[in-house]
């Protein structure tokens, strides 16, 4: 069976085209290549209910399994701004230098359990924001950790935000580039792997690998066939940020050599497979994309 993998920097248009191409051939597509236990079809679970601007008015901020100073420095600066205005910051996870003071509640699952089961009167008395990082949900019990974080946010009537570290992740999940059971289920029995710029994953022997991307990274070294695609700076593309807001990236320069726009490579390949995708331009693709996900308009 064919399997499509969506890398961290793929625009929504390419993820959507890959999904339609691979699923049209009876295969499956997966964007959670780091193993994150994010729930397909539940946007409040993989994006949250908060906006980044909510940080500015928060009276308390709870960080679970994330290091915003490293993962999102600009967002961390906003947290520091809220702290400087009197917001309390709590951390469940590794104790690191966040450039502001915080209450460290522990670094293991027991600390999270204690947080969820404990006295939350302080959180209830403040405008509280819960921020959950990817590090908390990549382990085998990631789904349970996510559920506990959401339960804490619900009990304390807090706003909830998932901090993503992959630019393509939210948009790819919005268009359904996921497989029930995650990466392991998608890769089971795969004989052809179409790798759309996923360089953080080890693909085992046996499968025929097609790599479409812009850099000679791990994915390209494992490939049997390489299709040079444009980098995110070399094509117009849609991305959805960590708060679920669609954003348009504009081309800064043209792709070198024979490299093409990523959606166009997939469209051309679909013609060779006699399974032509129903769009001949980026505008037509976006029309189909918005029809599938109106909030991406």
Where are these regions (language model features)?
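Short glycine-rich phosphate-binding loop at a beta-alpha junction
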Residues: 2-7, 129-131
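Cofactor-cradling patches in redox/metallo enzymes
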Residues: 5-15, 70
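Phosphodiester-processing cores and adjacent nucleic acid-binding clamps
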Residues: 19
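Non-catalytic alpha/beta scaffold blocks inside enzyme catalytic domains
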Residues: 25, 29, 33-296
